[in-house]
A protein has these predicted regions:
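Nucleic acid-binding interface residues in structured DNA/RNA-binding domains
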Residues: 2-165
Length: 165
């Protein structure tokens, strides 16, 4: 029996096991990131479905930005927990971006302005379709200035453009 790789659109489908709330442990892969956001061992952390992440991504209008940190904070508030797993959220952001491009190539439109979603610190996402080069072009098309921070690309003064969701 041969294996067929799932499409990005298939990967974007909600999972039956999510959302799920867990108590934060030091061994969690997202521990360091959620700890930086204020969560402590024993605090409740939510893992959500891709649709919840996409819902927040779609709220960002042209000329505005959001980072994974703001997305996680909004989702955590919605679920009345201390934090949202940044690892699964980051994966779903990347899946949403690739699914949007896949749909576009098939003549569809998911209306996900994924390029307005940045990594923490305003950095561009190398896992978006076309890598940071394409991400940079899409952001510059909307008037954002891209700078080099260390060895990575970021939006200059990204904090000024953050949408409050």
């Amino acid at each position: 029996m041969s294996y067929r790789r799932k499409s990005w659109l298939e990967k974007l489908a909600d999972k039956k096991c999510l959302p799920k709330t867990l108590r934060l442990e030091k061994g969690f892969p997202c521990y360091n990131a959620v700890h930086k956001m204020g969560a402590e061992v024993g605090d409740k952390v939510v893992l959500v479905n891709p649709s919840e992440v996409v819902e927040v991504m779609k709220m960002v209008p042209e000329g505005r930005l959001i980072t994974i940190v703001e997305i996680c904070r909004k989702i955590a508030r919605k679920h009345r927990v201390k934090a949202c797993c940044t690892l699964t959220t980051g994966i779903f952001i990347m899946v949403a971006a690739n699914a949007a491009e896949e749909a576009s190539k098939q003549g569809g439109n998911l209306n996900i302005p994924y390029w307005r979603t940045l990594k923490a610190g305003g950095f561009l996402n190398e896992k978006y379709p076309g890598g940071v080069g394409s991400h940079k072009k899409l952001l510059e098309k909307e008037g954002f200035k891209i700078i080099r921070k260390g060895g990575k690309l970021a939006v200059s003064d990204y904090e000024k453009y953050l949408v409050h969701v």
